[in-house]
Amino acid sequence: MTQITLLTPDDWHLHFRDGDMLQETVPATARLFQRAIVMPNLLPPVTDAKMVTEYRERILAARPAGSTFEPLMTIFLTNNTTEQDIIDAKAAGVVAAKLYPAGATTNSDAAVKALDALFPVFEAMAKHGMLLLVHGEVTESHIDIFDREAMFIERYLARIVAAFPTLKVVFEHITTKDAADFVMSAADNVAATITPQHLLLNRNDLLVGGVRPHNFCLPVLKRSTHQEALRAAVATGSSKFFLGTDSAPHEKHRKESACGCAGCYSAWSALELYAQVFDDLGALDKLEGFASKHGPDFYGLPRNTSTVTLVKEKWTVPSEIILPNGNPIVPFFAGEEINWKVKTA
């Protein structure tokens, strides 16, 4: 197959950041994606309806002229979140609330420390039809970073899912066989997003031959057996798995430093990279479901009706992009050749 046409995809997990960065990130995503679930981990985090509304306006202002791209907004759960916060957020158009264990990712220090205390909030979310998006890692310092996802399932996620059978839960950016197996065996109210980097890479690509800071993300890349389990999961065509890039930009100097930031900025190449994965797996016929159908179906939103076409044509990801402030950012797969390209008129 040398050409494939898909319903226009959506990105069910990304980070736009804020300020000048929006002038880069919003157009990059709006290029191909009709909608995107926008993460709320700003400084300070987006915790209520007023902050959501203001952030959404800043995103809309950064859209290219004529764009119909729609940001789907989320709020950041803390131990101070109340049922009224959920009601107000829902009224403001928020579709989901994000659970970050404190310290699990960029700007998550304000996040949840005592998870059981949030059970009344989860109950309110189920009642009001708001989805729960989960960064599924424990954060205790003595637990090995490669084991934190599996431990979270065992300690917390299994209990949340069992306690709230009507709450829709998205296990975000899964990285392990444990997570893929959990989602596959769970009831229909549980789904997962998978990033391009976790399908394309494993921890050798982070650490062998030198540290590769632009492949560093959280949850961290795992061993190849986990990568293969994720690839096998998407190749099944199961509606429980859908596209979420976790595109997460940091300026070059913040990645290439003594304490580099976590995140892969994949917005400029994500759909093409997913196509490459599905092609390698002999499962191109499953790409449209993963990219364009399973996400809106799970969220209870209409599928897009427009289309995008990819052609099998090699191109090279730019080595860097200059941000509006003049600083460079290194995109995911910088300088690498990709086999699929978006067909332009």
Swiss-Prot record:
Keywords: Hydrolase, Metal-binding, Pyrimidine biosynthesis, Zinc. Disulfide bonds: none annotated. It catalyses: (S)-dihydroorotate + H2O = N-carbamoyl-L-aspartate + H(+). Zn(2+) 1 binds at residues 13, 15, 98, 246. The modification N6-carboxylysine is found at residue 98. Substrate binds at residues 15-17, 41, 135, 218, 250, 262. Belongs to the metallo-dependent hydrolases superfamily. DHOase family. Class II DHOase subfamily. Catalyzes the reversible cyclization of carbamoyl aspartate to dihydroorotate. This is Dihydroorotase. It comes from Shewanella pealeana (strain ATCC 700345 / ANG-SQ1). The gene is pyrC.
